[in-house]
UniProtKB/Swiss-Prot annotation:
The gene is uvrC. The UvrABC repair system catalyzes the recognition and processing of DNA lesions. UvrC both incises the 5' and 3' sides of the lesion. The N-terminal half is responsible for the 3' incision and the C-terminal half is responsible for the 5' incision. Residues 1-20 are annotated as: Disordered. One of its GO terms (cellular component) is cytoplasm. It comes from Jannaschia sp. (strain CCS1). It comes from the Bacteria. This is UvrABC system protein C. Keywords: Cytoplasm, DNA damage, DNA excision, DNA repair, Excision nuclease, SOS response. The keyword DNA repair applies. Residues 34-112 form the GIY-YIG domain. Interacts with UvrB in an incision complex. SMART domains: GIYc (SM00465), HhH1 (SM00278). CDD domains: GIY-YIG_UvrC_Cho. GO terms for molecular function: DNA binding; excinuclease ABC activity.
């Protein structure tokens, strides 16, 4: 929002001795008016405790100025408040949007916080090629084509793509691979592709298959089946038995796909079904994605809540943060009403550009969908609480085995991956009381040009130096949860000696670290543990703590290998076009599709280059000069 907010009363009124929180707040109330806006409560270290919105700032903030009558959570928040900040807005809807944006940015201690907010994958049917590709897509929708989603997970997308390939025989290869084929690939042999790369299907027939696939993704499967059945009958009457058999197989495959999808609500075309279950100061929100009358998967979320927060407040905070960077669907079906229903409708409708309907259904098919989501939320939270309890016992055991002061809340495990020093990547995974914190995982592209190929010590030094130098810069007072309580390093005495040197150089002497080595005969179960200045030790083969350490080490190894493969794959697919100024991914695809290879692009003249869609005369000149200046 530009030019629609202004800061007011950011400085507390002049006071003498330190006042209780409710008196500090009362001093601010006298400076406020009845404008809508957002308020922030800060502690004595200027850390944000809470972000809230208000239709009338003066009235809302005044409710905190009472010395009693608050819930335990609010009472603690008021007690810790040393100052406040305010932003006025033109409308309460703007205040809601600003509030949720600040909560995600500042992560205040007393707010409900959505901790896992990754983007969701979509299916893209591209239209930049005569034979469009169908593929999984995540991120901004810059590429031309039709997008379908969101899907709850990559697995849900992959299953749908497999089904579409079975039914419609569409290609999933890249344009560069498509242009380079001289014979059909294995997918053609197993009847998962129609072989357009080698002319086994005409552009017209392939286009018809693409249109059918798009109709299926839009939910028109009943009409599509009827059309295919009519086509099969017409082909039989015309004695085109091969075509009739192909249509029969497509109808069968389409029927199998529909029966395998499970939940397929007929009365709900486009909606997110969102249900909340709270228990023991914890919460689970279950989201089902219904698109084109089909269930495109579900995802569970575990927002940070307090014991005395009510369901409407939790659900409102979840919706605001969940749709902050996502377009909402036409309908939201909720298990509980939210605190500001009309306000949320206005905010989400503004984001979508058309009316968004929010319902709390009590009967019928929609209520059954919500009940199913609520049941899933309850069961998921039960499993999560059991896992957290078991994880807590393992962390207690880890503290006992390694002589820590208490169970670690954040364990960081480090590993490197490379092939003789090439495409080297460092990896960090994070574990805590709630299991693996995958949103906290980090990969480090090794930049050390002076490193000897395969120098694991040098790679570890670079990774840890970058990690802790950043921590020291961003959080020198250890105020956030980003600082680890324990480091696990893949390696023995040499690695631990190198780590100690790094930590000494950085002045970090309060983070314990342990080296994990596989022992003299490299057998799993005979791991040896190294601590600086102490004897090597081992755990019993059947010790649950040993299995726990092995799982964390294996997870770090898996993540490191995945990062290494991605880096290597990117390097393999690199071409000289990557270095041409003004040529991004889209124009690179267009050039390769038109010419077939980077070498052909390098040989092209200016008129050939300008014939490519999206290549202007100026860019064509840059491309031509780039390759001919190098010649």
């Amino acid at each position: 929002m530009k030019n629609e907010t202004e800061a007011v009363a950011d400085q507390p009124p002049k006071t003498g001795p330190v006042k209780p929180g409710h008196e500090v707040i009362a001093d601010y109330v006298r400076t406020l008016d009845m404008s809508p806006g957002v308020y922030r409560m800060l502690d004595s270290q200027s850390r944000v405790l809470y972000v809230g919105k208000a239709r009338a700032l003066k009235r809302r903030v005044a409710s905190y100025a009472k010395p009693s009558g608050h819930s335990p959570r609010i009472a603690r928040m008021i007690r810790d408040t040393a100052s406040m900040m305010f932003l006025t807005t033109r409308t309460e809807t703007e205040a809601l949007l600003l509030e949720q944006n600040l909560i995600k940015q500042l992560k205040p201690k007393f707010n409900v916080l959505l901790r896992d907010d990754k983007s969701f994958p979509n299916i893209l049917v591209s239209d930049e090629h005569a034979f469009p590709q169908i593929k999984k897509h995540r991120g901004s929708k810059k590429e031309k084509g039709s997008y379908f989603g969101p899907f709850a997970s990559a697995g849900a997308v992959n299953r749908t793509l497999n089904q579409l390939q079975k039914v419609f025989l569409l290609r999933n290869c890249t344009d560069a691979v498509f242009e380079s084929r001289t014979r059909p690939c294995l997918l053609y042999q197993i009847k998962r592709c129609s072989g357009p790369c080698v002319g086994h299907i005409s552009e017209e027939d392939y286009g018809a298959s693409v249109k059918d696939a798009v109709r299926f993704l839009k939910g028109d499967s009943t009409d599509l089946q009827r059309q295919l059945a009519d086509g099969m009958a017409a082909a039989s009457e015309a004695m085109e038995f091969e075509r009739a058999a192909a249509l029969r197989d497509r109808i069968r495959a389409l029927t199998n796909v529909q029966s395998a999808q499970g939940i397929n609500p007929q009365g709900v075309k486009e909606a997110d079904v969102i249900a909340l279950h709270m228990e023991g100061g914890q919460a689970c929100v279950q989201v089902f994605f219904i698109r084109a009358n089909q269930n495109w998967g579900n995802r569970d979320f575990y927002p940070r809540v307090g014991a005395d927060i009510e369901e409407p407040e939790v659900l409102e905070a979840f919706l605001g943060q969940f749709y902050d960077q996502k377009e909402p669907p036409k309908q939201l079906l909720l298990s509980h009403p939210v605190e500001s229903m009309d306000l949320m409708v206005d905010a989400l409708s503004g984001k979508r550009g058309t009316k968004v309907e929010i319902l709390v259904p009590q009967r019928g098919e929609k209520a059954e969908l919500v009940d199913g989501a609520r049941r899933n939320a309850r069961e998921s939270l039960g499993r999560k609480m059991a896992e957290t309890q078991a994880q807590g016992k393992l962390l207690d055991g880890l503290a006992g085995a390694f002589g820590l002061d208490g169970p670690p809340k954040r364990v960081e495990v480090y590993d490197n991956s490379h092939i003789q020093g090439a495409h080297a990547v460092g990896a960090m995974i994070v574990a805590g009381p709630e299991g693996y914190l995958k949103s906290q995982y980090r990969k480090f592209n090794i930049k050390g040009g002076s490193l000897t190929p395969g120098d694991d010590f040098g790679m570890m030094k670079e990774v840890l130096t970058r990690r802790f130098a950043r921590l020291l810069k961003e959080d020198p007072d250890r105020e956030t949860e980003a600082w680890p309580d324990l480091l696990l390093i893949d390696g023995g005495a040499g690695q631990i000696s190198a780590v100690k040197e790094i930590m000494d150089d950085l002045g970090v002497d309060d983070v314990p670290f342990i080296g994990v080595a596989k022992g003299i005969d490299r057998d799993q179960g005979k791991e040896e543990f190294y601590r600086p200045g102490q004897p090597v030790f081992a755990l019993k083969r059947n010790d649950p703590v040993l299995y726990f350490v092995q799982r964390m080490r294996d997870e770090a190894h898996r993540f490191a290998i995945g990062a290494h493969r991605a880096k290597r794959s990117k390097a393999v697919s690199a071409t000289p076009l990557d270095d041409v100024p003004g040529v991004g991914a889209g124009r690179k695809r267009a050039l390769l599709a038109h010419f077939g290879s980077a070498k052909a692009v390098a040989r092209a003249n200016l008129s050939d280059l300008t014939a490519v869609d999206g290549v202007s005369e100026g860019l064509a000149q840059k491309i031509y000069d780039f390759f001919h200046d190098q010649a």
